[in-house]
Amino acid sequence: MTHQTHAYHMVNPSPWPLTGALSALLMTSGLIMWFHFNSTALLMLGLTTNMLTMYQWWRDIVRESTFQGHHTPTVQKGLRYGMILFIISEVLFFTGFFWAFYHSSLAPTPELGGCWPPTGIHPLNPLEVPLLNTSVLLASGVSITWAHHSLMEGNRNHMLQALFITIALGVYFTLLQASEYYEAPFTISDGVYGSTFFVATGFHGLHVIIGSTFLIVCFFRQLKFHFTSNHHFGFEAAAWYWHFVDVVWLFLYVSIYWWGS
């Protein structure tokens, strides 16, 4: 690291934002190809490119923060603001889905039969798998808080145990959601109910997968002693994101599964 007279991180040119954008284009185009032409080739290419980008970008950030010491308190403050703004943007993103749902359900049109759920739709029982999913995510919220407090107290083993439990619960939630989709008596093409249900819960499921990936990276970093009790923003950001995913699910459960059924 060359001598510098300021606390800011002057980032080196990186190809990963470009490859990340290209992978996003390939994945969204691949999703359309899969839906309309039953071909997964483009989607698989997009997912592969995305995984490679994630690995290499995370590797660079770990190198800059842990080994080169670029993440000074000033830089960490900027990263905190960035993560907060990112979560706010995600809140607005999900607000759009809730808006679509309530716009359709509070005043059902004659085309829907003037009722909600629309005529012919058999909604899922909110007291079965959705309630179990709620319990799983609430438990994961407790375990991630346990992990955070263990890290701040310097208790490495408890932190690893709690983080592993959180990851396991996240994976379990994803499997439950997949089984629910498989057994659902309606599809994404079943009018406004199907589209709002699958888009809202599907994007939440995607965020659970992203959050689980974030936590898995933190787990391996903790195994390599990357975090200390006062320098662990990578884990803190993952914990914030996980709590956000928890809260969104509670709104989804109350709105779409319970009230909407």
Curated annotation (Swiss-Prot):
Topological domains, Mitochondrial intermembrane: 35-40, 106-128, 184-190, 257-261
Pfam (any one): COX3
Keyword Coiled coil listed: no
Residue intervals passing through the bilayer: 16-34, 41-66, 73-105, 129-152, 156-183, 191-223, 233-256
UniProt keyword list: Membrane, Mitochondrion, Mitochondrion inner membrane, Translocase, Transmembrane, Transmembrane helix
InterPro entries: Cyt_c/ubiquinol_Oxase_su3 (IPR024791), Cyt_c_oxase_su3_dom (IPR033945), Cyt_c_oxidase-like_su3 (IPR000298), Cyt_c_oxidase_su3-like_sf (IPR035973), Cyt_c_oxidase_su3_a-hlx (IPR013833)
Residue ranges, Mitochondrial matrix side: 1-15, 67-72, 153-155, 224-232
Recorded GO CC terms: mitochondrial inner membrane; respiratory chain complex IV
Main enzyme class: translocase
Family recorded in the similarity comment: Belongs to the cytochrome c oxidase subunit 3 family.
Function: Component of the cytochrome c oxidase, the last enzyme in the mitochondrial electron transport chain which drives oxidative phosphorylation. The respiratory chain contains 3 multisubunit complexes succinate dehydrogenase (complex II, CII), ubiquinol-cytochrome c oxidoreductase (cytochrome b-c1 complex, complex III, CIII) and cytochrome c oxidase (complex IV, CIV), that cooperate to transfer electrons derived from NADH and succinate to molecular oxygen, creating an electrochemical gradient over the inner membrane that drives transmembrane transport and the ATP synthase.
Entry protein name: Cytochrome c oxidase subunit 3
Gene: MT-CO3
